[in-house]
Amino acid sequence: MAFRSDCAIIGACGSKGQKSERMTGMEQMRRVRTTLKDIANACGYSVNTVSRALRGDKRLSKATRSLIQETARSMDYIPNTMASSLRSGRSRMIAVIVNDLHNQHFCDLLNRMDRDLRDQNYNLMILCMHLEETLAGELIHTAISLSVDGILYFPNFGQRHYIEYMTDSGVPFVLLDRRVNEVDADTVRCDDEQGGYLAGQHLAALGHRRFLFLSGMELSSSQIDRLSGFRRALRDSGLPDDCVRVVPGADVEDALAHNTLASFILPRDYTAIVSFRDEVAYPVMNALRDHGLSIPQDVSIISFDNLHAEDPSRPFLTSIYAADENIAEISVRLLLERIEDPMLPPRNIVLPVRIFDQGTTAPPPRA
Protein backbone atom coordinates (compact mmCIF):
# COMPACT_ATOMS: atom_id res chain seq x y z
CA MET A 1 0.00 0.00 0.00
CA ALA A 2 1.36 3.44 -0.91
CA PHE A 3 1.30 6.25 1.65
CA ARG A 4 0.94 9.92 0.74
CA SER A 5 3.92 11.90 1.93
CA ASP A 6 1.64 14.60 3.36
CA CYS A 7 -0.85 12.31 5.10
CA ALA A 8 -1.89 13.49 8.54
CA ILE A 9 -1.65 11.56 11.78
CA ILE A 10 -3.40 13.19 14.70
CA GLY A 11 -0.91 14.29 17.30
CA ALA A 12 2.12 13.64 15.10
CA CYS A 13 2.79 17.28 14.31
CA GLY A 14 2.79 20.44 16.36
CA SER A 15 -0.23 22.72 16.70
CA LYS A 16 -1.03 25.39 14.12
CA GLY A 17 1.64 28.04 13.90
CA GLN A 18 4.36 25.81 15.32
CA LYS A 19 7.25 24.79 13.14
CA SER A 20 7.44 21.01 12.70
CA GLU A 21 9.54 18.63 10.70
CA ARG A 22 7.76 17.20 7.64
CA MET A 23 7.65 13.36 7.69
CA THR A 24 6.49 10.73 5.25
CA GLY A 25 3.64 8.40 6.24
CA MET A 26 6.08 5.54 6.86
CA GLU A 27 8.26 7.75 9.05
CA GLN A 28 5.21 8.78 11.05
CA MET A 29 4.24 5.15 11.57
CA ARG A 30 7.76 4.33 12.72
CA ARG A 31 7.75 7.36 15.03
CA VAL A 32 4.42 6.37 16.57
CA ARG A 33 5.28 2.72 17.31
CA THR A 34 6.66 2.20 20.79
CA THR A 35 9.93 0.29 21.07
CA LEU A 36 11.55 -1.66 23.89
CA LYS A 37 14.01 1.20 24.23
CA ASP A 38 11.14 3.66 24.77
CA ILE A 39 9.77 1.49 27.58
CA ALA A 40 13.25 1.07 29.07
CA ASN A 41 13.76 4.86 29.13
CA ALA A 42 10.34 5.36 30.74
CA CYS A 43 10.93 2.72 33.43
CA GLY A 44 14.61 3.21 34.09
CA TYR A 45 15.49 -0.40 33.28
CA SER A 46 17.70 -1.90 30.59
CA VAL A 47 16.24 -3.06 27.26
CA ASN A 48 17.16 -6.64 28.21
CA THR A 49 15.24 -6.41 31.49
CA VAL A 50 12.21 -4.95 29.70
CA SER A 51 12.31 -7.77 27.16
CA ARG A 52 12.47 -10.39 29.91
CA ALA A 53 9.60 -8.79 31.84
CA LEU A 54 7.36 -8.72 28.77
CA ARG A 55 8.09 -12.43 28.24
CA GLY A 56 6.97 -13.08 31.83
CA ASP A 57 10.42 -14.12 33.07
CA LYS A 58 9.79 -15.15 36.68
CA ARG A 59 13.43 -14.64 37.62
CA LEU A 60 12.48 -10.95 37.81
CA SER A 61 10.47 -9.81 40.81
CA LYS A 62 6.71 -9.61 40.41
CA ALA A 63 6.84 -5.88 41.14
CA THR A 64 9.37 -5.29 38.35
CA ARG A 65 7.39 -7.36 35.87
CA SER A 66 4.15 -5.58 36.76
CA LEU A 67 5.69 -2.12 36.46
CA ILE A 68 7.23 -2.82 33.06
CA GLN A 69 4.14 -4.57 31.71
CA GLU A 70 1.85 -1.76 32.85
CA THR A 71 4.17 0.82 31.30
CA ALA A 72 4.15 -1.11 28.03
CA ARG A 73 0.34 -1.16 28.04
CA SER A 74 0.10 2.55 28.77
CA MET A 75 2.48 3.27 25.87
CA ASP A 76 0.46 1.04 23.48
CA TYR A 77 3.40 -1.26 22.92
CA ILE A 78 2.88 -3.80 20.10
CA PRO A 79 5.30 -6.76 20.31
CA ASN A 80 7.34 -7.68 17.25
CA THR A 81 6.14 -11.26 16.94
CA MET A 82 8.45 -12.00 14.01
CA ALA A 83 11.51 -11.09 16.04
CA SER A 84 10.21 -13.11 18.99
CA SER A 85 9.64 -16.05 16.68
CA LEU A 86 13.19 -15.90 15.39
CA ARG A 87 14.56 -15.85 18.94
CA SER A 88 12.37 -18.63 20.34
CA GLY A 89 11.88 -20.80 17.26
CA ARG A 90 8.12 -20.60 17.88
CA SER A 91 5.62 -18.42 16.03
CA ARG A 92 2.80 -19.02 18.56
CA MET A 93 0.58 -19.37 15.49
CA ILE A 94 -1.67 -22.35 14.70
CA ALA A 95 -3.24 -22.76 11.25
CA VAL A 96 -6.62 -24.39 10.85
CA ILE A 97 -7.47 -25.60 7.34
CA VAL A 98 -11.20 -26.01 6.90
CA ASN A 99 -13.36 -27.08 3.98
CA ASP A 100 -16.26 -24.62 4.13
CA LEU A 101 -16.90 -21.57 6.31
CA HIS A 102 -20.60 -21.60 5.37
CA ASN A 103 -20.94 -24.73 7.49
CA GLN A 104 -22.04 -23.55 10.95
CA HIS A 105 -20.65 -26.70 12.55
CA PHE A 106 -17.15 -25.70 11.44
CA CYS A 107 -17.65 -22.12 12.64
CA ASP A 108 -18.69 -23.30 16.10
CA LEU A 109 -15.59 -25.50 16.31
CA LEU A 110 -13.31 -22.67 15.17
CA ASN A 111 -14.73 -20.36 17.81
CA ARG A 112 -13.99 -22.86 20.58
CA MET A 113 -10.54 -23.69 19.20
CA ASP A 114 -9.64 -20.01 19.13
CA ARG A 115 -10.69 -19.62 22.76
CA ASP A 116 -8.73 -22.69 23.88
CA LEU A 117 -5.61 -21.66 21.93
CA ARG A 118 -5.70 -18.11 23.31
CA ASP A 119 -5.75 -19.58 26.80
CA GLN A 120 -2.40 -21.17 25.86
CA ASN A 121 -1.03 -17.94 24.33
CA TYR A 122 -1.47 -19.09 20.71
CA ASN A 123 -3.16 -17.29 17.83
CA LEU A 124 -5.36 -18.98 15.24
CA MET A 125 -5.00 -18.52 11.48
CA ILE A 126 -7.96 -19.71 9.37
CA LEU A 127 -7.38 -21.02 5.83
CA CYS A 128 -10.42 -22.17 3.83
CA MET A 129 -10.64 -24.54 0.85
CA HIS A 130 -14.11 -23.27 -0.15
CA LEU A 131 -15.06 -26.83 -1.18
CA GLU A 132 -12.17 -26.92 -3.69
CA GLU A 133 -10.04 -29.96 -2.91
CA THR A 134 -7.20 -28.72 -5.14
CA LEU A 135 -6.67 -25.77 -2.78
CA ALA A 136 -5.65 -28.05 0.09
CA GLY A 137 -2.03 -28.45 -1.00
CA GLU A 138 -1.66 -24.71 -1.59
CA LEU A 139 -3.06 -23.88 1.85
CA ILE A 140 -0.85 -26.41 3.59
CA HIS A 141 2.15 -24.94 1.77
CA THR A 142 1.06 -21.43 2.84
CA ALA A 143 0.75 -22.48 6.48
CA ILE A 144 4.17 -24.13 6.51
CA SER A 145 5.81 -21.18 4.71
CA LEU A 146 4.44 -18.86 7.42
CA SER A 147 6.22 -21.00 10.05
CA VAL A 148 3.11 -21.98 11.97
CA ASP A 149 3.78 -24.14 15.00
CA GLY A 150 1.09 -26.62 14.02
CA ILE A 151 -1.93 -27.34 11.80
CA LEU A 152 -5.48 -28.39 12.66
CA TYR A 153 -6.72 -29.96 9.44
CA PHE A 154 -10.25 -30.93 8.39
CA PRO A 155 -9.50 -33.39 5.56
CA ASN A 156 -11.90 -33.43 2.64
CA PHE A 157 -12.56 -36.70 0.79
CA GLY A 158 -9.53 -38.47 2.30
CA GLN A 159 -6.64 -36.46 0.82
CA ARG A 160 -3.95 -38.94 1.87
CA HIS A 161 -1.32 -37.29 -0.35
CA TYR A 162 -1.77 -33.95 1.43
CA ILE A 163 -1.50 -35.64 4.81
CA GLU A 164 1.70 -37.36 3.68
CA TYR A 165 2.99 -33.93 2.59
CA MET A 166 2.45 -32.56 6.11
CA THR A 167 4.11 -35.62 7.61
CA ASP A 168 7.16 -35.24 5.35
CA SER A 169 7.41 -31.51 6.17
CA GLY A 170 7.72 -32.25 9.88
CA VAL A 171 4.98 -29.80 10.89
CA PRO A 172 2.87 -31.07 13.82
CA PHE A 173 -0.77 -31.60 12.84
CA VAL A 174 -4.06 -33.11 13.97
CA LEU A 175 -6.82 -34.39 11.67
CA LEU A 176 -10.39 -33.54 12.60
CA ASP A 177 -13.91 -34.68 11.87
CA ARG A 178 -13.06 -37.26 9.20
CA ARG A 179 -11.71 -40.80 9.06
CA VAL A 180 -8.74 -41.22 6.73
CA ASN A 181 -7.84 -44.87 6.11
CA GLU A 182 -4.26 -46.15 6.27
CA VAL A 183 -2.88 -42.95 7.80
CA ASP A 184 -1.02 -42.96 11.12
CA ALA A 185 -1.70 -39.51 12.53
CA ASP A 186 -3.35 -37.81 15.49
CA THR A 187 -7.08 -37.79 14.75
CA VAL A 188 -10.15 -36.49 16.60
CA ARG A 189 -13.60 -37.30 15.24
CA CYS A 190 -17.10 -38.36 16.19
CA ASP A 191 -18.27 -41.94 15.89
CA ASP A 192 -20.32 -41.34 12.73
CA GLU A 193 -21.20 -45.02 12.29
CA GLN A 194 -22.62 -45.07 15.80
CA GLY A 195 -24.51 -41.85 15.02
CA GLY A 196 -26.15 -43.39 11.97
CA TYR A 197 -27.02 -46.48 13.99
CA LEU A 198 -28.66 -44.39 16.73
CA ALA A 199 -30.78 -42.58 14.14
CA GLY A 200 -32.00 -45.83 12.60
CA GLN A 201 -32.57 -47.51 15.95
CA HIS A 202 -34.51 -44.50 17.27
CA LEU A 203 -36.83 -44.23 14.26
CA ALA A 204 -37.40 -47.98 13.95
CA ALA A 205 -38.30 -48.18 17.64
CA LEU A 206 -40.94 -45.49 17.05
CA GLY A 207 -42.49 -47.71 14.40
CA HIS A 208 -41.23 -46.11 11.18
CA ARG A 209 -40.80 -48.46 8.22
CA ARG A 210 -40.15 -46.11 5.27
CA PHE A 211 -37.32 -43.58 5.23
CA LEU A 212 -35.80 -40.75 3.21
CA PHE A 213 -32.02 -40.32 3.73
CA LEU A 214 -30.59 -36.96 2.61
CA SER A 215 -26.88 -37.62 2.07
CA GLY A 216 -23.74 -35.57 2.48
CA MET A 217 -20.99 -35.49 -0.15
CA GLU A 218 -20.41 -38.92 -1.63
CA LEU A 219 -16.77 -39.53 -0.65
CA SER A 220 -17.00 -38.00 2.82
CA SER A 221 -16.16 -40.58 5.49
CA SER A 222 -18.87 -39.07 7.69
CA GLN A 223 -21.47 -39.67 4.98
CA ILE A 224 -20.27 -43.23 4.34
CA ASP A 225 -20.22 -44.12 8.04
CA ARG A 226 -23.56 -42.52 8.92
CA LEU A 227 -25.41 -44.26 6.10
CA SER A 228 -23.67 -47.55 6.94
CA GLY A 229 -24.67 -47.29 10.59
CA PHE A 230 -28.23 -46.33 9.65
CA ARG A 231 -28.64 -49.35 7.36
CA ARG A 232 -27.15 -51.64 10.01
CA ALA A 233 -29.70 -50.45 12.57
CA LEU A 234 -32.57 -51.09 10.15
CA ARG A 235 -31.28 -54.60 9.41
CA ASP A 236 -31.01 -55.27 13.15
CA SER A 237 -34.65 -54.15 13.40
CA GLY A 238 -35.67 -56.65 10.72
CA LEU A 239 -36.26 -54.08 7.97
CA PRO A 240 -35.24 -54.62 4.31
CA ASP A 241 -32.61 -52.51 2.54
CA ASP A 242 -35.16 -51.11 0.09
CA CYS A 243 -37.09 -49.33 2.86
CA VAL A 244 -34.70 -46.37 2.44
CA ARG A 245 -34.69 -43.90 -0.44
CA VAL A 246 -31.23 -42.27 -0.53
CA VAL A 247 -30.80 -38.85 -2.15
CA PRO A 248 -27.15 -38.20 -3.20
CA GLY A 249 -25.40 -35.29 -1.53
CA ALA A 250 -24.79 -33.46 -4.81
CA ASP A 251 -28.55 -33.51 -5.53
CA VAL A 252 -29.30 -32.23 -2.03
CA GLU A 253 -26.89 -29.30 -2.40
CA ASP A 254 -28.27 -28.49 -5.86
CA ALA A 255 -31.84 -28.48 -4.53
CA LEU A 256 -30.82 -26.15 -1.70
CA ALA A 257 -29.10 -23.77 -4.11
CA HIS A 258 -32.09 -23.65 -6.48
CA ASN A 259 -34.87 -23.84 -3.88
CA THR A 260 -36.22 -27.09 -5.34
CA LEU A 261 -36.40 -29.27 -2.23
CA ALA A 262 -39.90 -30.36 -3.21
CA SER A 263 -38.34 -32.41 -6.01
CA PHE A 264 -37.34 -35.12 -3.55
CA ILE A 265 -39.57 -34.61 -0.50
CA LEU A 266 -42.56 -35.24 -2.79
CA PRO A 267 -44.10 -37.70 -3.43
CA ARG A 268 -44.13 -38.74 0.22
CA ASP A 269 -43.09 -42.39 0.15
CA TYR A 270 -41.64 -42.18 3.68
CA THR A 271 -42.69 -41.31 7.22
CA ALA A 272 -39.26 -40.26 8.53
CA ILE A 273 -36.35 -38.22 7.16
CA VAL A 274 -32.70 -38.53 8.14
CA SER A 275 -30.63 -35.49 7.15
CA PHE A 276 -26.82 -35.62 6.96
CA ARG A 277 -26.56 -32.25 8.72
CA ASP A 278 -28.77 -29.72 10.49
CA GLU A 279 -28.20 -26.98 7.93
CA VAL A 280 -29.98 -29.16 5.37
CA ALA A 281 -32.67 -30.28 7.82
CA TYR A 282 -33.85 -26.75 8.61
CA PRO A 283 -34.86 -25.77 5.04
CA VAL A 284 -36.34 -29.26 4.56
CA MET A 285 -38.54 -28.65 7.61
CA ASN A 286 -39.68 -25.35 6.09
CA ALA A 287 -40.44 -27.05 2.77
CA LEU A 288 -42.51 -29.74 4.50
CA ARG A 289 -44.55 -27.10 6.31
CA ASP A 290 -45.01 -25.16 3.06
CA HIS A 291 -46.69 -28.30 1.70
CA GLY A 292 -49.04 -28.55 4.65
CA LEU A 293 -47.16 -31.25 6.57
CA SER A 294 -46.67 -31.09 10.33
CA ILE A 295 -43.52 -32.16 12.19
CA PRO A 296 -43.52 -34.67 13.83
CA GLN A 297 -47.23 -35.50 13.45
CA ASP A 298 -46.98 -36.20 9.70
CA VAL A 299 -43.22 -36.58 9.19
CA SER A 300 -40.43 -37.23 11.69
CA ILE A 301 -37.00 -35.72 11.04
CA ILE A 302 -33.64 -36.38 12.68
CA SER A 303 -30.28 -34.90 11.78
CA PHE A 304 -26.64 -34.43 12.83
CA ASP A 305 -24.60 -31.56 14.40
CA ASN A 306 -27.01 -30.24 17.09
CA LEU A 307 -26.61 -26.62 16.01
CA HIS A 308 -29.43 -25.56 18.33
CA ALA A 309 -27.08 -26.08 21.28
CA GLU A 310 -24.80 -23.30 19.98
CA ASP A 311 -27.60 -21.06 18.70
CA PRO A 312 -30.84 -21.37 20.71
CA SER A 313 -32.58 -19.02 18.26
CA ARG A 314 -32.66 -21.90 15.77
CA PRO A 315 -35.78 -24.11 15.70
CA PHE A 316 -35.81 -27.25 17.79
CA LEU A 317 -34.52 -30.28 15.89
CA THR A 318 -33.77 -33.78 17.12
CA SER A 319 -30.09 -34.18 16.31
CA ILE A 320 -27.10 -36.43 16.95
CA TYR A 321 -23.66 -35.25 17.94
CA ALA A 322 -20.81 -35.11 20.44
CA ALA A 323 -20.26 -31.78 22.15
CA ASP A 324 -18.25 -29.25 20.11
CA GLU A 325 -16.26 -28.23 23.17
CA ASN A 326 -14.95 -31.78 23.52
CA ILE A 327 -13.74 -31.93 19.90
CA ALA A 328 -12.11 -28.50 20.13
CA GLU A 329 -10.52 -29.09 23.53
CA ILE A 330 -9.14 -32.51 22.65
CA SER A 331 -7.80 -31.49 19.23
CA VAL A 332 -6.02 -28.45 20.69
CA ARG A 333 -4.57 -30.53 23.52
CA LEU A 334 -3.31 -33.22 21.14
CA LEU A 335 -1.70 -30.65 18.86
CA LEU A 336 0.10 -28.82 21.68
CA GLU A 337 1.34 -32.16 23.04
CA ARG A 338 2.57 -33.07 19.54
CA ILE A 339 4.40 -29.72 19.30
CA GLU A 340 6.15 -30.39 22.61
CA ASP A 341 6.95 -34.03 21.81
CA PRO A 342 7.03 -34.91 18.08
CA MET A 343 7.92 -38.54 18.92
CA LEU A 344 4.60 -39.36 20.61
CA PRO A 345 2.78 -42.33 19.03
CA PRO A 346 -0.27 -41.37 16.91
CA ARG A 347 -3.51 -40.99 18.88
CA ASN A 348 -6.90 -41.78 17.32
CA ILE A 349 -9.71 -40.31 19.41
CA VAL A 350 -13.24 -41.39 18.42
CA LEU A 351 -15.85 -39.57 20.50
CA PRO A 352 -19.17 -41.25 21.30
CA VAL A 353 -22.32 -39.46 20.15
CA ARG A 354 -25.84 -39.28 21.53
CA ILE A 355 -29.29 -38.17 20.45
CA PHE A 356 -30.44 -34.71 21.52
CA ASP A 357 -34.21 -35.30 21.40
CA GLN A 358 -35.91 -31.98 20.73
CA GLY A 359 -39.33 -33.13 19.66
CA THR A 360 -39.14 -33.58 15.88
CA THR A 361 -39.62 -37.37 15.93
CA ALA A 362 -42.73 -39.34 16.87
CA PRO A 363 -44.51 -42.55 15.88
CA PRO A 364 -45.67 -42.51 12.25
CA PRO A 365 -49.23 -41.41 11.47
CA ARG A 366 -51.80 -44.16 11.22
CA ALA A 367 -52.68 -45.17 7.67
Predicted features and spans:
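Flexible loop/turn connectors
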Residues: 5, 259-367
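Short acidic capping loops at alpha-helix termini that bridge into adjacent secondary structure
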Residues: 209-210, 241-244, 294-301
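Hinge/beta->alpha junction and helix N-cap segments in small-molecule ligand-binding domains
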Residues: 98-108, 126-135, 178, 188-198, ...
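Short beta-strand segments enriched in small/hydrophobic residues
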Residues: 42, 47-52, 86-102, 202, ...
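N-terminal helix-turn-helix DNA-binding module of bacterial transcription factors
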Residues: 2-90, 366
